[in-house]
Amino acid sequence: MSVHPTQTLSLSQYLIEEQLKLPQATGDFTALMSHLVYAAKIVSREVRKAGLLENILGATETVNVQGETQMKLDEYADKVFNHTLTRSGHLCILGSEEHEETVPVPNGYKIGKYTIAIDPLDGSSNIDANVSIGTIFSVHLRKSPAGTPGTLSDLLQQGSGQRAAGYVLYGSSTMLILCTGKGVSGFTLDPSCGEFILSHPDMQIPETGGIYSINEGNYNYWSDEVKNYIRDIKSIEGGRKPQSGRYIGSLVADFHRNLLKGGIFLYPNDTKSTKYPNGKLRLLYEAAPMAFIAEQAGGMAVTVYGERILDLTPKELHERTTLVVGSKKEVEHFLKFAPKKS
């Protein structure tokens, strides 16, 4: 069933209303978000028909900077977001999971005052299984002088300083979850009018939840502390109700379910591979934006050692971290088991 745009609030209307509340607003942020959303709509369209097009679905021969084989849709999404955002006139520099170095604004285009760090297509290894995937982004205000090309230091800022963060979930419907530091709002794409409509205002994650999300296939490689925590929440001692395990393998999808229903998502480090001693998720464009959303929705986000994610400042573009995020009381319970950082 389609939603009539005159009876509800579109994302465009929402952004303008928020802009009018700030006397100092210039409209730059609103315009930047419009470009990002435009790119997301294009990617959403391709995701929906990916199974029909042989040249969109599946892997390419290239390997990205993370050492991961790029899926064709991954590559496509990266090109769409890069082209749209760097030519928007509101961005000074872009950081992407798919590029080893930062992506500058092309010659001849206006240099703006914002930075964006982005994972163009999170969970892309699940594309051919038709599992929900998504785009994650983080927005900062530049630190370098206005009008000059952006620098890496403009991107490497503490998570608590984010001007906005969000994700687009490409699932049974396409949703945008947006946080500008004043709560969390959810928008659903109405295909009949091509607009994101405010469907989930003032989102709050339940304080507790009965769901835990972790890749239990790595159990034997975890620290004893993480093993003890998982055993505890699965225990039925004393008549307790054990928590239910739900793990999709797509950060956006797992986080989104827990945001709505309550629960906890964990991605600890392990000894399975020496390649990721500090965890596998990227701090700048995965952990930090999700932490920003979680805290604004009343939840918590920490490393496996109990450090607040938003207090961390990345030292490099693709810095990795552990992540424990979700309902406040569930994360607090995890902290009782958290290992000490050596």
Swiss-Prot record:
Location relative to the cell: Cytoplasm
The cofactors named for this UniProt entry are: Mg(2+)
Carries keyword Metal-binding?
A: yes
- Quote the record's binding site residues for substrate: D122, G123, S124, S125, N215, Y247, K280
Instruction: Tell me how this protein assembles.
Output: Homotetramer.
Q: Which HAMAP family match?
A: FBPase_class1 (MF_01855)
Recorded hits in PANTHER family, A to Z, give:
FRUCTOSE-1,6-BISPHOSPHATASE-RELATED (PTHR11556), SEDOHEPTULOSE-1,7-BISPHOSPHATASE, CHLOROPLASTIC (PTHR11556:SF35)
The name on file for this protein is: Fructose-1,6-bisphosphatase class 1
Provide the species name: Leptospira interrogans serogroup Icterohaemorrhagiae serovar Lai (strain 56601)
What lineage is this protein's organism placed in?
Bacteria, Pseudomonadati, Spirochaetota, Spirochaetia, Leptospirales
